[in-house]
Amino acid sequence: MRKIGIFGGTFDPPHYGHLLMANEVLHALQLSEIWFMPNRIPPHKQHEQVTKSEDRLRMLELAIADHPRFHIETIELEREGPSYTYDTIRQLLSMHPDHEFYFIIGADMVEYLPHWYKIAELIQLVTFVGVKRPGFSTETSYPIMEVEVPQFAVSSSMIRDRVRKGQTIRYLVPECVRLYIEERKLYGARKSVNSR
């Protein structure tokens, strides 16, 4: 049985914090692979503007290209409407009955578990992995495995904000992602500022 870590998110854009978290969980739990799973419309972000799926997918492909055990699962991008983890995990289990899935969430999402769609059924299908973050607790009544990860205080929203303000994002995202953002003028990028 293969142990697969599922790392869902908008990845708008993917950054070194995502890669660090995925790599630490991969090794801490001795997983076979990490599958990054970009969502089309996450239920908790239905009213936020999200960058086009094609751009987010391409940035993710670029970001993980050099890691042999990182892969992308596009099942949620292909589904219309909001992406519910319960539906996704059921579909993945039917496609890969020989896999055991570990769903990776940051400590900031642990407190929302009681509000997740069909959470009682979901915890029977998948093992949740809570990654500790400063200022958030991984304490919950639901069974989760905890993983300590070195802190890297960066977020996708902070990166988008820095790009909008014309500030550098070098060393916050892989260089290939930075160049893609610049080339596609995502988040209001201006080449002359972001090249620094």
Curated annotation (Swiss-Prot):
Listed A to Z, the keywords are: ATP-binding, NAD, Nucleotide-binding, Nucleotidyltransferase, Pyridine nucleotide biosynthesis, Transferase
Q: What does this protein do?
A: Catalyzes the reversible adenylation of nicotinate mononucleotide (NaMN) to nicotinic acid adenine dinucleotide (NaAD).
Task: Provide the catalytic activity annotation.
Answer: nicotinate beta-D-ribonucleotide + ATP + H(+) = deamido-NAD(+) + diphosphate
Gene3D superfamilies (alphabetical): HUPs (3.40.50.620)
Query: Which Gene Ontology molecular function entries are recorded, alphabetically?
Result: ATP binding; nicotinate-nucleotide adenylyltransferase activity
Q: In which pathway does it act?
A: Cofactor biosynthesis; NAD(+) biosynthesis; deamido-NAD(+) from nicotinate D-ribonucleotide: step 1/1
Q: InterPro entries, per this entry?
A: Cyt_trans-like, NadD/NMNAT, Rossmann-like_a/b/a_fold
HAMAP family from the UniProt entry: NaMN_adenylyltr
Tell me one Pfam family matched here: CTP_transf_like
Stated family = Belongs to the NadD family.
Q: What is its EC number?
A: 2.7.7.18
Q: What class of enzyme is it?
A: transferase
The Gene Ontology biological process annotation of the record reads: NAD biosynthetic process
**UniProt-recorded name of the protein:** Probable nicotinate-nucleotide adenylyltransferase
